[in-house]
Amino acid sequence: MERSTRELCLNFTVVLITVILIWLLVRSYQY
């Protein structure tokens, strides 16, 4: 259970960071 929770949290964090980076790139590209 702990491993699954950690993996899920890690995956969520990686996805969140990736989305934020892409969003910043898109904004900087637009402006």
From Swiss-Prot:
One of its GO terms (cellular component) is sarcoplasmic reticulum membrane. Pfam families: Sarcolipin. Residues 1-7 are cytoplasmic. It is found in: Sarcoplasmic reticulum membrane; Endoplasmic reticulum membrane. InterPro entries: Sarcolipin. GO terms for molecular function: ATPase binding; enzyme inhibitor activity. GO terms for biological process: negative regulation of ATPase-coupled calcium transmembrane transporter activity; negative regulation of calcium ion import; negative regulation of calcium ion import into sarcoplasmic reticulum; negative regulation of protein-containing complex disassembly; positive regulation of protein depolymerization; regulation of ATPase-coupled calcium transmembrane transporter activity; regulation of calcium ion transport; regulation of cardiac muscle contraction by calcium ion signaling. It is a single-pass membrane protein. Keywords: Endoplasmic reticulum, Membrane, Sarcoplasmic reticulum, Transmembrane, Transmembrane helix. Changing residue 29 to A: Reduces inhibition of ATP2A1-mediated calcium uptake. The keyword Transcription regulation does not apply. Residues 27-31 are lumenal. Its main location: membrane. The keyword Endoplasmic reticulum applies. It comes from the Eukaryota. The chain crosses the membrane at residues 8-26. Homooligomer. Can also form heterooligomers with other sarcoplasmic/endoplasmic reticulum calcium ATPase (SERCA) regulators ARLN, ERLN, PLN and STRIT1/DWORF. Monomer. Interacts with calcium ATPase ATP2A1/SERCA1. Interacts as a monomer with ATP2A2/SERCA2; the interaction decreases ATP2A2 Ca(2+) affinity. Interacts with VMP1; VMP1 competes with PLN and SLN to prevent them from forming an inhibitory complex with ATP2A2. Reversibly inhibits the activity of ATP2A1/SERCA1 and ATP2A2/SERCA2 in sarcoplasmic reticulum by decreasing the apparent affinity of the ATPase for Ca(2+). Also inhibits the activity of ATP2A3/SERCA3. Modulates calcium re-uptake during muscle relaxation and plays an important role in calcium homeostasis in muscle. Required for muscle-based, non-shivering thermogenesis. Belongs to the sarcolipin family. This is Sarcolipin. It comes from Oryctolagus cuniculus (Rabbit).
